[in-house]
């Protein structure tokens, strides 16, 4: 048997995996010998390993699809089709809709509904929509979708041009893979030898219409999350009058909110993973992948092969002007500003929305975190200036959630006019959790509602979110795999969970969350000796071992994420099986790619070819996660409970996708009556139920709609935020001084004095319990000072630097003034020096409370 192969321009033979699987071990070794794949010749590999090795170095590229603009490409294709001999093959069984409708600058996707009957030889090929005069009107792709082989979908990249002809007589030329690949190389200027004739299937088309997309009146809304991002638009009647009833919008709802959907490989999802991957580093334009495409990039890499994927990119906002090193599989690298990468991520979402709803977006509303509202808005003003709406009327995430609640209560007529309501919202997202309080009241005027809303940031945890839950599952998975492969030095999952099976809430009240997970952490570190995931520790090892360990982490973390979704995305998933073998179709099974995991065997990292199945049940996972979830609820609610403030709130709302876990509600009941908690979890929900995640988008769009149509006069106000940090320093004699106390009062500037030399002032960021998070250094140099009068200093810094404080500075001393900046979520340090009774003002420096230096990241290679 011979393998199916493709001869490219350089005469390299490429092999298909499906054909290799039918060959004998001897035939596979012969391919390795012939193709000089030394790893398959020297080492005694079995059949699976030989196939993996051949596919790595000589695997056929699956599809050669024309998906982007190449100067002169369309002209070359059109000229060839006009001048070559075209042989029409019989195609009675092939047909398409009588009319195709395209929009200028927008793509045609599977949801547009243009299909032809399935024909294997046409799957993954290019098709050419031609006019009767052989004018090339559009370049299309024929693709399968959702793993079904009933039909092929006609799609088109947004970058490719479309045109109509005078005569309404069109046809679609479809061709086999070899001819399609030839046209691909011709389009990109790579093919020099062209066939004398080309065989095609010709599908008649009555009409091909190209329209201009409609511009939406309202902004689109984006909820940028640590793990997932969502987006949506409000479609009014005017929109439907313009676009008509074509397939693309037949499932859209008129005068309602409609969500952007993203293709996840098996279907469509309203959630886009906030993940960015690097496909290629090029001088002109780096090729980046987003969401599911970025995750597939990481999953497609070989065990010791490099890949560059960024998770948790929402944390970049605090330091968006920093640079990140991007690297592709060829090892090419360069530095790119975070702001530029984020801009391209949001443009991707905007383009997906435009393509989905056949429209143009003129404005974008992006909900911001409550505590970083002003910093967040400034960043988006810089990276997306062409899309920014009125900054002053943009909602933060909590306010958007609250407005959605108010809107629903108005529809249900459950709000009393002029009564002041107080709400407490716990937003547990993928990477962070925030607690905010809100006051609101409404007045029903003749023309519109008048709504007053005030928000106050109460507390937060930058290190707790859905990723923590995934990480805990990953820890148990890693330990189970190490035990399953024969290492009995690590305790079993059963033994670990038996240790944790106690009166969890009271144990954490007395000993804390760290003590609850101490035994788990201890055994997890033992498992690291067999199945390493701390790839940061391997940066000094060779490239191959570094990427093996990096693949270990991402494979286990992504598998744990799938396990979490099965348990908490679908009611009834009481048990999940993790297996490396593709067996009969079983419900609630996660397939673990054994080729991506490397275990220590002696002094080398090797693939474990036989990985036994691992079973996890719902009750084990509930026990595992109870400590984390109670810990965060206790942190937020205990002070409110003991002070009695909890009774002031009309209701408590849980939002964020992680909050659909029942453990949150159970933990809250320790502090408040259950009927106060607004917790949405309908019976028989499935994995497509994203209601909690969509609340922020819903609220933002309802707010934008009500303002635009004059349905509500909305007044927004920000209360004084509670800062969960303290800034301290030490005097010359070792006494600690609190410069900023966010727990008590952070409006007042703190001061500390030093003798003037070129000195370094250490500053300490601590939490409410006095635990140190981070150390900052302010470097003070004499050349940075300039002489100023107090009046000049006051004109710049106002009440932050009082005259009585500057008058007390002795000659030769410098006094540091430190105060918090609520809007910037950080603090300022300004030195004032006195010499010969004259004042000198030093350089001001701003420090962010939350930075890469201390905020916990699950993707830094240290887990």
Tell what function each PLM region has.
Residues 2-68:
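Basic helix-extension-helix modules of the SAP/HeH family
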Residues 68-182, 250-364, 368, 478-561, ...:
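Phosphate-binding loop and its immediate beta->loop->alpha context
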Residues 237-271, 419, 446-459, 680-685:
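Flexible phosphate/Mg2+-sensing switch loops adjacent to catalytic phosphate-binding sites
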Residues 342, 470-475, 479, 517-715:
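Helical "lid/coupling" subdomains associated with nucleotide-phosphate turnover
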Residues 353-360, 370, 376-420:
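Hydrophobic, small-residue-rich alpha-helical packing segments that form membrane-like cores
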């Amino acid at each position: 048997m011979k393998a199916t192969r493709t001869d490219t321009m350089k005469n390299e033979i490429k092999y298909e995996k499906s054909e290799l699987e039918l060959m004998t071990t001897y035939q596979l070794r012969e391919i390795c010998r012939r193709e000089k794949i030394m790893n398959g010749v020297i080492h005694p590999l079995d059949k699976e390993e030989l196939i993996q090795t051949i596919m790595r170095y000589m695997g056929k590229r699956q599809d050669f699809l024309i998906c982007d603009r190449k100067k002169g490409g369309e002209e070359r294709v059109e000229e060839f089709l006009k001048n070559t001999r075209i042989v029409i093959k019989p195609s009675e069984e092939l047909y398409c809709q009588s009319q195709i409708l395209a929009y200028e600058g927008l793509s045609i996707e599977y949801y547009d509904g243009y299909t032809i009957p399935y024909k294997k030889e046409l799957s993954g090929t290019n098709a050419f929509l031609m006019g009767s005069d052989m004018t090339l009107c559009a370049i299309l792709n024929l693709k399968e979708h959702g793993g079904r082989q009933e039909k092929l979908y006609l799609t088109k990249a947004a970058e490719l041009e479309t045109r109509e002809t005078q005569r309404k007589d069109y046809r679609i030329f479809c061709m086999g893979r070899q001819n399609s690949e030839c046209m691909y190389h011709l389009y990109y200027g790579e093919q020099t030898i062209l066939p004398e004739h080309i065989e095609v299937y010709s599908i008649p088309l009555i009409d091909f219409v190209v329209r201009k997309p409609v511009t939406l009146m309202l902004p689109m809304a984006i909820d940028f999350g640590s793990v997932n991002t969502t987006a949506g638009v409000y479609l009014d009647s005017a929109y439907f009058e313009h676009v008509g009833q074509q397939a693309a919008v037949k499932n859209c709802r008129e005068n309602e909110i409609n969500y952007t959907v993203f293709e996840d490989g098996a279907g469509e999802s309203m959630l886009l993973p906030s993940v960015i991957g690097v496909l290629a580093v090029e001088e002109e334009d780096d090729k980046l992948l987003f969401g599911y495409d970025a995750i597939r990039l990481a999953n497609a890499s070989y065990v010791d092969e490099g890949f560059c994927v960024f998770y948790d990119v929402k944390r970049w906002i605090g330091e968006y002007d920093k640079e990140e090193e991007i690297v592709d599989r060829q090892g090419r690298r360069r530095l790119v500003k975070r702001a530029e990468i984020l801009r391209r991520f949001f443009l991707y979402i905007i383009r997906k929305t435009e393509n989905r709803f056949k429209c143009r977006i003129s404005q974008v509303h992006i909900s911001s975190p409550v505590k970083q509202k002003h910093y967040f808005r400034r960043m988006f003003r810089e990276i997306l200036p062409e899309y920014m709406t009125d900054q002053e009327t943009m909602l933060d995430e909590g306010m958007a959630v609250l407005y959605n609640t108010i809107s629903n209560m108005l529809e249900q007529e459950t709000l009393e006019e002029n009564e002041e309501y107080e709400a407490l919202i716990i937003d547990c997202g993928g990477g962070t959790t925030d607690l905010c309080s809100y006051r609101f009241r409404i007045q029903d005027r003749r023309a519109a509602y008048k709504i007053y809303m005030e928000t106050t940031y109460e507390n937060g945890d930058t290190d707790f979110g859905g990723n923590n839950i995934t990480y805990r599952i990953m820890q148990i998975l890693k330990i189970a795999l190490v035990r399953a492969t024969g290492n009995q030095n690590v305790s079993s999952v059963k033994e670990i969970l038996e240790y944790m099976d106690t009166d969890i809430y009271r144990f954490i009240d007395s000993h804390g969350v760290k003590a609850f997970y101490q035994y788990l952490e201890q055994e997890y570190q033992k498992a690291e000796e067999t199945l390493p995931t701390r790839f940061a520790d391997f940066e000094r090892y060779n490239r191959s071992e570094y990427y093996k360990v990096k693949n270990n982490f991402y494979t286990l973390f992504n598998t744990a994420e799938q396990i979490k979704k099965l348990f908490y995305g679908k009611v009834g998933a009481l048990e999940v099986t993790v297996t490396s073998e593709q067996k009969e179709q079983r419900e609630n099974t996660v397939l673990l790619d054994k080729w991506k995991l490397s275990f220590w065997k002696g002094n080398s990292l090797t693939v474990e070819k036989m990985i036994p199945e691992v079973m996890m049940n719902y009750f084990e996972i509930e026990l595992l996660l109870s400590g984390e979830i109670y810990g965060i609820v206790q942190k937020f609610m205990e002070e409110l409970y003991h002070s009695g403030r909890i009774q002031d709130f009309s209701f408590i709302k849980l939002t964020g996708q992680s909050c659909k876990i029942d453990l949150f509600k159970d933990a809250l009941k320790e502090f408040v009556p259950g009927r106060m908690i607004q917790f949405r979890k309908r019976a028989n929900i499935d994995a497509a139920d994203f209601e909690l995640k969509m609340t922020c988008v819903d609220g933002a769009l309802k707010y934008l709609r009500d303002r635009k149509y004059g349905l509500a006069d909305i007044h927004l106000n920000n209360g004084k935020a509670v800062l969960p940090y303290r800034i301290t320093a030490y005097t010359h004699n070792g006494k600690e001084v609190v410069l900023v106390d966010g727990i008590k009062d952070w409006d007042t500037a703190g001061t500390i004095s030093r003798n003037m030399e070129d000195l370094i002032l250490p500053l300490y960021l601590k939490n409410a319990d006095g635990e140190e998070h981070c150390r900052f250094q302010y470097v003070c140099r004499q050349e940075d000072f300039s002489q100023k009068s107090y009046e000049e200093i006051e004109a710049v810094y106002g009440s932050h630097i009082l005259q009585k404080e500057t008058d007390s500075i002795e000659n030769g001393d410098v006094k540091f003034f430190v105060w918090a900046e609520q809007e910037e979520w950080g603090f300022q340090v300004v030195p004032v020096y006195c010499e010969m009774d004259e004042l000198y003002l030093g350089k001001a420096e701003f420090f962010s409370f939350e930075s890469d230096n201390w905020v916990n990241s699950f993707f830094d290679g240290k887990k």
